[in-house]
Every structure is written in structure tokens, then in C-alpha cells.
Design a protein with these regions (language model features):
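Structural motif of enzymes handling amino- and sulfur-group chemistry
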Residues: 37, 43-50, 73-132, 137-141
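Conserved small/polar residues in nucleotide/adenosyl-binding loops
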Residues: 165-169
């Protein structure tokens, strides 16, 4: 079983959020986008696998032009672990950040982000005409302006243009 943890896998570092991910350790693989809560540039993603052989079965190729670069022994040929043959050292940036910031501090920052979404929800509910579409969870709260005097169709017509220009606040 694969878990798409692109956004949510970072909750494993959070004291409060990790309870939402009970059972994730049973998965065969997890994808995780470190650029989504870990102060990384876009494109810093990780795939964690229980069995390396699954990556090898998925991506291994043996073109003639790579035969002279083949490794012997227990070291993997990294081109057999993913689709890119040449890749930037994205993992080094993540590793360095983890060494400097630490997993405990990242957990605190994620917990803080989740608390801020809950606080935003409380503030939004204080104003008439605003409704919560999806309650605060994992650092996100979805809301819209929906005055009672307008129908759902009118509220949608009012909010659609806003969603094109203001995706996040």
C-alpha cells in the first residue's frame, strides 16, 4: 500500500498531528513533499520505501551507455532508483536543514501552523456572513463569504472570482 503524504506526512514530526497518521508505518511506501512544510525549495520530495527492490523493479534500466559505470557489491546504481539519471543534490539541502533546525523544532513549527489555522477559524466565525467550508485541520481552514440573504448559487457566483485571485490568505 502506498501513502501519498505529499502535504500531510510532515505531521509525523508534530506532537499533535502525528496521531492523525496512526498506521502509516504499515505502508510499503510514502511520498512526502518536503517543500510543503520543511522550508525547502519547490521540487524537494522524498519517496520512502520499505523494500528497495520495489524501486528497482519500477525504475531499473540497463542501457549500454551505462554499463561502464555499473557498481559492484552492495552499493545501488542510483539511476535504478528513480527516473532521473542526473539529478541535483536536493536531499543535501533537506539533510542540512534537518541538522540545523532539528525535527523537534519542525514539529513545534507544524503544531504552531495548525494552531494558527484553528485561531483563524475562530476569528472568521466572529463575522456575520462567513462560513467554514472545511474545518481547521493540518494547518488549513477553508471558508467562504455566504450571507444568509443569498442563495447557494449567488454565494458561489460571488466567491468564484475571489478564488481565482486569492487562493490563500
Amino acid at each position: 500500500m502506498h501513502v501519498d503524504g505529499a502535504y500531510g506526512a510532515s505531521l509525523l514530526l508534530s506532537r499533535q498531528g502525528r496521531r492523525l497518521l496512526s498506521g502509516i508505518a504499515l505502508s510499503d511506501s510514502i511520498s512526502w513533499d518536503a517543500h510543503k512544510w520543511m522550508m525547502q525549495t519547490y521540487g524537494c520530495s522524498v519517496v520512502l520505501v520499505r523494500e528497495q527492490k520495489n524501486l528497482l523493479r519500477s525504475f531499473s534500466t540497463h542501457p549500454e551507455y551505462l554499463e561502464d559505470a555499473k557498481t559492484e557489491g552492495s552499493l545501488p546504481d542510483f539511476w535504478d532508483l528513480g527516473p532521473e539519471l542526473t539529478r541535483p543534490a536536493r536531499a543535501l539541502k533537506l539533510w542540512t536543514t534537518l541538522q540545523i533546525v532539528g525535527t523537534d523544532r519542525f514539529g513545534e513549527m507544524i503544531d504552531h501552523g495548525c494552531r494558527m489555522a484553528e485561531l483563524a477559524q475562530e476569528e472568521i466565525l466572529k463575522y456575520p456572513g462567513w462560513e467554514i467550508v472545511s474545518p481547521a485541520g493540518q494547518g488549513v481552514v477553508c471558508f467562504r463569504y455566504a450571507p444568509k440573504e443569498l442563495s447557494d448559487r449567488e454565494c458561489d457566483a460571488l466567491n468564484v472570482p475571489v478564488s481565482y485571485t486569492h487562493l490563500t490568505l
